[in-house]
Regions:
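Extracellular/periplasmic helix-loop-helix junction of adjacent transmembrane segments
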Residues: 28-61
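Flexible cytoplasmic inter-helical loops of multi-pass small-molecule transporters
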Residues: 187-204
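Intracellular juxtamembrane helix-capping segments at the cytosolic ends
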Residues: 34, 107, 115-129, 136-137
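Small-residue-rich segments within alpha-helical transmembrane domains of MFS-like 12-TM solute carriers
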Residues: 22-24, 111-119, 145, 149
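Helix-loop-helix hairpin linking two adjacent transmembrane segments in secondary transporters
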Residues: 139-189
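Juxtamembrane cytosolic amphipathic helices that cap and anchor the N-termini
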Residues: 2-13, 98, 207-221
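Conserved MFS/SLC helix-loop-helix module at the cytosolic interface between two early adjacent transmembrane helices
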Residues: 61-100
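Hydrophobic core of transmembrane alpha-helices in multi-pass small-molecule transporters
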Residues: 19, 89, 100-116
């Protein structure tokens, strides 16, 4: 008989994944160091800020591309893929000595990684807790929010000791390993037949969510 995965371990892995992804939002720490390092090239805040804006925009794109396949393929592969993209984007930013490269690595690649991993990890956590969906969703969201608060100071310390570009490389490798390792325990949740006690309102499809104005309002907030 196949052993049922520990759902609390899966929830912990999802929280750790989202906390790691939250490093992408420690942009203020990274941007200051980038501007100081590339002052001779004439980089200004308006230019470097575009990298973060692109990353922010690519997150829902990643959700649109990968989200509809999570239920059929399973969350593990998309969290793993997200970890590869996120870590690679962060690591490659360590070589971004021009703005176009910065936009590609930190903007496009890293942003798509967040979209793939965050959507899958949050989804699997809530599906393993049909009786505590609010708790699971709240904890995974909190993990993401705590990411920049926890990793930001670490990044600042690394920047002071080794510089911004080496910091990107170190964080890229470490966070890739953390996210990809966490993905290994994210088994697909079993289908639970609804009863009078556990029946849940039918969820929306990704297309329906994207047509919902409330979704975009919450995302912008």
């Amino acid at each position: 008989m196949k052993k049922t995965p520990n759902r609390w371990l899966i929830l912990a892995a999802a929280i750790l994944t989202n906390l790691s992804l939250g490093a992408g939002y420690a942009w203020s720490v990274f941007q200051k160091a980038l501007l100081e390092t590339n002052a001779s090239q004439g980089w200004v805040q308006a230019q470097t800020s575009l990298a973060f804006s692109i990353s922010f925009a690519m997150v829902p794109v990643g959700m649109i591309l990968f989200g509809p396949k999570v239920d059929s393929v399973g969350p593990k592969k998309f969290v793993f893929l997200g970890g590869i993209l996120f870590g690679t984007g962060m690591f490659a930013t360590g070589f971004a000595n021009s703005l176009p490269v910065l936009y590609l690595t930190y903007g496009v690649v890293l942003g798509l990684g967040i979209g793939s991993a965050y959507g899958a990890s949050t989804s699997v956590a809530t599906k393993w807790f049909p009786d505590k969906k609010g708790l699971a969703g709240g904890l995974t969201a909190a993990g993401f929010g705590l990411g920049p608060l926890i990793i930001g100071p670490v990044a600042k310390s690394l920047i002071a000791s080794m510089g911004i570009y080496s910091t990107f490389k170190v964080l890229g490798i470490v966070l890739l390993l953390v996210i990809c390792t966490s993905s290994l325990v994210m088994a697909k949740a079993p289908t639970v037949a609804p009863t009078a006690g556990n029946a849940q309102p039918e969820g929306k499809t990704y297309k329906e969510v994207l047509r919902d104005g409330n979704y975009w309002l919450l995302w912008l907030i």
